[in-house]
Swiss-Prot record:
UniProt lineage: Eukaryota, Metazoa, Chordata, Craniata, Vertebrata
Resulting phenotype, residue 317 to A: Increases peak current amplitude and causes a positive shift in the voltage-dependence of activation
Main location group: membrane
Species name: Homo sapiens
Keyword vocabulary terms for this entry: Autism, Autism spectrum disorder, Cell junction, Cell membrane, Cell projection, Disease variant, Epilepsy, Ion channel, Ion transport, Membrane, Metal-binding, Phosphoprotein, Postsynaptic cell membrane, Potassium, Potassium channel, Potassium transport, Synapse, Transmembrane, Transmembrane helix, Transport, Voltage-gated channel, Zinc
Annotated protein name in UniProt: A-type voltage-gated potassium channel KCND2
Length: 630
């Protein structure tokens, strides 16, 4: 058997390399394996109108993503044979490059929030960003998160107290945001004043104030005027105690509040006083009492609630915890090494003060921090050489983490400055809007009171002359909005003076009250850019009763609306959607001004029973609302 195989093997090898055919006939052609067209198909990706082309194999390298899985078929359009994505095409370029090269980069000019949204949509995680861009991406993302947190805190601080807030929530909100109420602001400044008084008293009581009768030695002020300082300390501690108890009672989580750093500072600031009350003045506990009095100096840390700079410093130290830990570890190693070397280098000198390695720690610390008090100096040549090396190494070790700490402090400081600037700009912008709308509304009401607006709108020439006298296009558009609201609703804008007079007349005389001249009540004006609706009753938003009842007033701003029944003009839908040429010209001459067309189903003139709508001869004093200036 083995001999037969050995004889056949050379022929098989020869046939394998093509020297000798094994079969007498020609070998059949191998079956041609047709490659699927879908494997090398060219895919067109339409991203907001921008076309991108790539191979299907390129996308299928990452099947866990949106483009690499079958989920992309949900975005396929058979008509155009494209995959359409309504996303940002600029960021998509970098995402498509990731499929091509396997490296994801972060574009520095793009918004970090938009970039994260695009990555999340296409199923990519930020951790795959290349090393060349990852650090900058993390920094930008951290800054954006801090900025969003500051904005959220600002919005929370600026919100007014909700009616559903409990007393506990109101007290905590007053402590955290003192500018929310007058009482909270007063308590904020009172506590700050007593903190300053307590710190100053703790310093002044150690100053010599002369000798008292019967004593030759000068006594400190704290002993000579013990009663006065005790009363002052008692008043400060009482304020601090009340503040701490109120914070503890109003805290959302008392357990977290007790464990917080500021809570520990508050306890340490007031605890020595209460311990001193129960301790006697014997000599056994005098040393412990003096030690407790030292802790009163920690009251100065309470200023961190009143100083933004101290809070920034605390945030900086917290963010640089790893760098500070590295600095402490490096200094500890260097101190131990150089203290040991200095001890053995000075061991042979009889006048040496390096009596032990722990005693050499003091010299090493002073030398590495470049202080050099001179109380301990090396005597030998070897000691002086190692002392010089110790001084140089201290400069290097301390200087390494300093730039990181400074950069973090600068970043946090400028971030707080930008947040303060944004808050100030937001307040100023809202104030300008309120002032502009309030001034425009007052001017509108003044024109109505004087009868100028209705007279000048009778003709096109007078209207254009009136518009030319307007202060700004904003005021013109605001007047036009108020005019359209009068024409499309059964409301009339009146000022507070007319509103009060009308209410008094309704209360005393049961007859229709006269109202101020209104554009909607003038004769001869039958068509405007907005036609008027005719309603029987209405409901005030956020009101508990219907607008037809008396006494329901929704206060929003200083402009009043009086509900009166008028003869309806044209209530057809065609008049509401009429073109600009079919209407009276607007009270503005700019060609780019658009018109707000109100297309709301108009109620029928008759009731479902077929009766005519009853006309009310008088208006209700409660059908008055106030229109917000914002």
């Amino acid at each position: 058997m083995a001999a037969g195989v050995a004889a056949w093997l050379p022929f098989a090898r020869a046939a394998a390399i093509g020297w000798m055919p094994v079969a007498s006939g020609p070998m059949p052609a191998p079956p041609r394996q047709e490659r699927k067209r879908t494997q090398d198909a060219l895919i067109v990706l339409n991203v907001s109108g921008t076309r991108f082309q790539t191979w299907q194999d390129t996308l299928e390298r990452y099947p866990d993503t949106l483009l690499g899985s079958s989920e992309r078929d949900f975005f396929y359009h058979p008509e155009t044979q494209q995959y359409f994505f309504d996303r940002d095409p600029d960021i998509f370029r970098h995402i498509l490059n990731f499929y091509r090269t396997g490296k994801l980069h972060y574009p520095r000019h793009e918004c970090i929030s938009a970039y994260d949204e695009e990555l999340a949509f296409f199923g990519l995680i930020p951790e795959i960003i290349g090393d060349c861009c990852y650090e900058e991406y993390k920094d930008r993302r951290r800054e954006n998160a801090e900025r969003l947190q500051d904005d959220a805190d600002t919005d929370t601080a600026g919100e007014s107290a909700l009616p559903t807030m409990t007393a506990r929530q109101r007290v905590w909100r007053a402590f955290e945001n003192p500018h929310t109420s007058t009482m909270a602001l007063v308590f904020y400044y009172v506590t700050g004043f007593f903190i300053a008084v307590s710190v100053i008293a703790n310093v002044v009581e150690t100053v010599p104030c002369g000798s008292s009768p019967g004593h030759i030695k000068e006594l400190p002020c704290g002993e000579r005027y013990a009663v006065a300082f005790f009363c002052l300390d008692t008043a400060c501690v009482m304020i601090f105690t009340v503040e701490y108890l109120l914070r503890l009672a109003a805290a959302p989580s008392r357990y977290r509040f007790v464990r917080s750093v500021m809570s520990i500072i508050d306890v340490v600031a007031i605890l020595p006083y209460y311990i001193g009350l129960v301790m006697t003045d014997n000599e056994d506990v005098s040393g412990a009492f003096v030690t407790l009095r030292v802790f009163r100096v920690f009251r100065i840390f309470k200023f961190s609630r009143h100083s933004q700079g101290l809070r920034i410093l605390g945030y900086t130290l917290k963010s640089c915890a790893s760098e500070l830990g590295f600095l402490l570890f490096s200094l500890t190693m260097a101190i131990i090494i150089f203290a040991t070397v200095m001890f053995y280098a000075e061991k042979g000198s009889s006048a040496s003060k390096f009596t032990s390695i722990p005693a050499a720690f003091w010299y090493t610390i002073v030398t590495m921090t470049t202080l050099g008090y001179g109380d301990m100096v090396p005597k030998t040549i070897a000691g002086k050489i190692f002392g010089s090396i110790c001084s140089l190494s201290g400069v290097l070790v301390i200087a390494l983490p300093v730039p990181v700490i400074v950069s973090n402090f600068s970043r946090i400081y400028h971030q707080n400055q930008r947040a303060d600037k944004r808050r100030a700009q937001k307040k100023a912008r809202l104030a300008r809007i309120r002032a502009a709308k309030s001034g425009s509304a007052n001017a509108y009401m003044q024109s109505k009171r004087n009868g100028l607006l209705s007279n000048q709108l009778q003709s096109s020439e007078d209207e254009q002359a009136f518009v030319s006298k307007s202060g700004s296009s904003f005021e013109t558009q605001h007047h036009h909005l108020l005019h359209c609201l009068e024409k499309t609703t059964n409301h009339e804008f009146v000022d507070e003076q007319v509103f009060e007079e009308s209410c008094m007349e309704v209360a005393t005389v049961n007859r229709p009250s006269s109202h101020s001249p209104s554009l909607s009540s003038q004769q001869g004006v039958t068509s405007t850019c907005c036609s008027r609706r005719h309603k029987k009753t209405f409901r005030i938003p956020n009101a508990n009763v219907s607008g037809s009842h008396q006494g329901s007033i929704q206060e929003l701003s200083t402009i009043q609306i009086r509900c009166v029944e008028r003869t309806p003009l044209s209530n057809s839908r065609s008049s509401l959607n009429a073109k600009m040429e079919e209407c009276v010209k607007l009270n503005c001459e700019q060609p780019y001004v658009t018109t707000a067309i109100i297309s709301i189903p108009t109620p029928p003139v008759t009731t479902p029973e077929g009766d005519d709508r009853p006309e009310s001869p008088e208006y209700s004093g409660g059908n008055i609302v106030r229109v917000s200036a914002l």
